[in-house]
Regions:
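Membrane-interfacial segments
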Residues: 25-34, 60-64, 89-94, 98, ...
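C-terminal halves and exits of single transmembrane alpha-helices
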Residues: 74-98
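Alpha-helical membrane-inserting segments
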Residues: 18-26, 52-56, 81-90, 120-128
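Cytosolic juxtamembrane regulatory segments of multi-pass membrane proteins
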Residues: 141-154
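N-terminal signal-anchor transmembrane alpha-helix
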Residues: 1-48
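Hydrophobic faces of alpha-helical transmembrane segments in multi-pass integral membrane proteins
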Residues: 10-18, 44-48, 73-78, 82, ...
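Alpha-helical membrane-associated segments of multi-pass integral membrane proteins
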Residues: 92-139
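Cytoplasmic membrane-interface segments at the C-terminal ends of transmembrane helices
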Residues: 2-5, 52-72, 119-144
Length: 154
C-alpha cells in the first residue's frame, strides 16, 4: 500500500507547494499589480506542468498506462483541490473572495495544464517506444526469435 500511494501523495504535496509558493510570491512582490500577479501565476502553472510532465515520463517508463493515469488523476486532483481550497487561506485570502468565476477558472487552468503535460509526456515516451508495454513487447520479440539453447551432451 505504501509503495503505491506514497509517490502519489508526494506528487500532490509537490504540486501544492509549487502553487503556494506562487501565491506567496505574488503576495510579496506583486501585491496590487495585476501584470506581475498574472506573470507569477503563469510561471507557477508552467512549473506545475513541468512537474506533471516529468512525473508522467518517469512513471510511464516503469508502470502500465492505466495505473499511471489513475495515479496522476489522484495526485493532480488532490493537489488541485488543496491548492484551490486551502492555498488562499495560507496567504490571507478566501477561496471565493473574487467570485465563483475565478474559483472555477483556477480549477480548469490547473487541470488543463496538467492534462496537456501528462498527454505530452505519455505521447513522447510511447512514440520513442520506451513505455512499459513497448519494452515488454520488445523483450518478447527478442525471446521468440532467439535460437533455442543447445542441450549439452555428455
Amino acid at each position: 500500500m505504501k509503495e503505491r500511494w506514497l509517490p502519489v501523495g508526494l506528487l500532490a504535496v509537490v504540486l501544492f507547494v509549487v502553487n503556494v509558493a506562487g501565491r506567496i510570491a505574488a503576495k510579496l512582490w506583486a501585491d496590487g499589480n495585476d501584470d506581475k500577479e498574472t506573470r507569477i501565476g503563469l510561471i507557477a502553472l508552467a512549473v506545475i506542468g513541468i512537474v506533471v510532465f516529468a512525473t508522467t515520463v518517469y512513471w510511464v517508463r516503469r508502470r502500465p498506462v492505466p495505473r499511471v493515469l489513475t495515479d496522476l488523476a489522484f495526485g493532480v486532483g488532490t493537489a488541485c483541490l488543496a491548492s484551490v481550497l486551502i492555498g488562499p487561506f495560507l496567504v490571507g485570502d478566501e477561496p471565493f473572495a473574487e467570485g465563483a468565476g475565478l474559483f472555477f477558472r483556477q480549477i480548469w487552468w490547473y487541470l488543463g495544464i496538467s492534462i496537456v503535460a501528462a498527454g505530452l509526456g505519455m505521447g513522447i515516451v510511447m512514440t520513442l517506444g520506451k513505455d512499459w508495454k513497448s519494452q515488454a513487447w520488445k523483450r518478447y520479440a527478442e525471446q521468440a526469435t532467439a535460437k533455442p539453447r543447445k542441450v549439452a551432451r555428455r
